[in-house]
Amino acid sequence: MSVLTDLIYGGSHAVAGLTEGAVNDAIAKYGADHPIAFPDTAYFFPTIYAATGVKVKTLGDLPACVGVLKSLITDREDLGQALNAGLATAVGAEIIEGLKFAEPKDAYEQATVPGIGFVPDPIIRSLGVPLVTGDIPGVAVVLGKADNGEDVAKVVKDYQSKGIMTFMVGDVIEQCADAGVKMGLELRVIPLGHDVTAVIHVVTVAIRAALIFGNVQPGDLAGLLKYTKERVPAFVNTFGAIDNVVVSAGAGAIALGFPVVVDIDLGENQVPGALESCTDHAETVKKSLELRGIKIKSKELPIPVAFAAAFEGEIIRKADMKVEFWSAKNTTCELVLMKNMDEVEDHKLVIDGPDIDSGDLEYALATCVYVAGKKMQADFESVIERKIHAWFNYMEGVMHTGQRNQFRIRISKDAYDKGLRLTHFAEVLYHMITDEFDAVVDKCEVHLITDPVKATAFLNDVAMPRYNMRDDRLASMTDESVDRFFTCILCQSFAPAHCCVVTPERLGLCGAVSWLDAKATYELNPNGPSQPIMKEGCLDERTGRYTTVNDAIKDATHGAVEEVTLYSIMEDPMTSCGCFECISGIEPMSNGFIVVNREYAGMTPAGMTFGELASCTGGGVQTPGYMGHGRHFISSKKFIHAEGGIERIVWMPKELKDDVGERLNKTAKELYGIDNFTDMIADETICTDCDALLEFLQEKNHPVLSLEPLM
């Protein structure tokens, strides 16, 4: 037996023994009927569920899983068999970690060291968009204890600057914290835990991606391994000495298609492309990205702070704040304006008023960007404008919330001390606009107005009239008023059988792609993810069925889906990928539909959580009665139009109801003459079971009670 396979089998046997003992101890302590589950997931023990189809619900379900684990450890002198033993280690790690949640207060809640443990389903779904757009180009797993903490911190910071999502296991967590690495889900540097078994929590992220986005069926191990290898851009870095358990865990990663880079010399035990040494930490990042085939588009900007999507979630507390621009205290606005070519001076950057080094804490800020180009259209102004929020947030030490004339920007003391000034904000806008919108923008000029009088004049005389004009245009834009819709296949890198059809009244289910966005995407990249669908061959106006849409869907999904309707949830509903903001599902007792947002973790009157509802669709599957969609679609006049429209909505979580309430009430008033329609819609503060829901609807005389049966 080779040294490598000997280490793998030794580690898998050790984990198998620990797992069996831990299961027996737990059953002796709590009993076989004691419930066990990871928090906020519809996929039970995800590794076991995906590989075998077994739904672990109680401790009594685990001994059989231990038996499966042992069967994978054959001790044969064969690398493929040894990799299976690595999968056995993954199963064992999942069981050991799962047992930590058998306690009333799980081990991660009690831990004195940082580590989030299990990653809930909603977080994975929220990562769908940044993964498919490339904002998160890859996933790194960093584990162990480096001989030099500064070295591993540099590696993690490098990943962070490149947008790579990094999960950490072991002493590297403290080493990075001591070196000043900023951590947290929002910063995409995530400490999982100290035990090596905690690595399973990133493994289950990859596995649930296959179930959520890829429609891989539970029990299809071959399909699972194919999906993770081809579609999940993950890799592993180990630091410091490695024992047989770490080697065995690495074998499990390799079986999933994730290459492992270690910082010790493995000599002849290396497996080219799968297990390689890199003893020079300065080369670790380059080697890892090359092995996984991840290409990073470098953004070298003339600014003194790091710039990456990983900083988009950074929170700047008041105590850490140097200056602030906030509409509650001063005039603020952001506007992109199209001009003629001779009216724009390319790369002209103007700061009109005091810069942030004048000593004040708060300032006015009117951001005006003039753009010109032969292919530029006024409709693209708002598309570019909405990107300002992301670009400012990409700067380390900057926090931006809101848009238009209602926003808040904070700059940290640390960023200020590094030299960040308003000129750098202007540089970011110029470089990002001319890079990302180069197909339509030939010249770009940026003005940042901090003079309060001039900023107010710009807001009143230029910005507000432009906002109002756009709003009037959007309000008049309906599916009937345009001659084409657009496909969006951004999510196909994760969900190959899914394709969105984006219309003026139905944005992409992720909530991030409007009809104007799709139109701009097509203009920027005619061969890209959004393609026009000429609105021809209407077969059924009620359901929104078109021959051209069906042809486009069949082509975009490579025949996986042949027909969709745009306005029905019961007849060939549009498919979903998995990163939808909300899901609507039938509630038979009331003859209506519930709408649930992914942030809601509680029970619904349908008897299912969001995750359980979402498992009914996703991955390009059409399930009549269930449909993923964006938040803004809820108040659309086209929302489940074929089934009667929004008057079928009977329940939604309070946070969602409050968010869409104003728009939803306006639509209900226009369509049905109903005032305050949301008062007729129940939420979790009123009921979470179907009997109480029906009683509430009867009390409110909800219009759904008089509609035709759905089935």
Language-model regions, residue ranges each:
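Acidic, serine/proline-rich low-complexity intrinsically disordered regions
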Residues: 1-389, 407-408, 566-573, 668-669
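Cysteine-centered metal-binding/redox modules
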Residues: 24, 28-31, 44, 48-49, ...
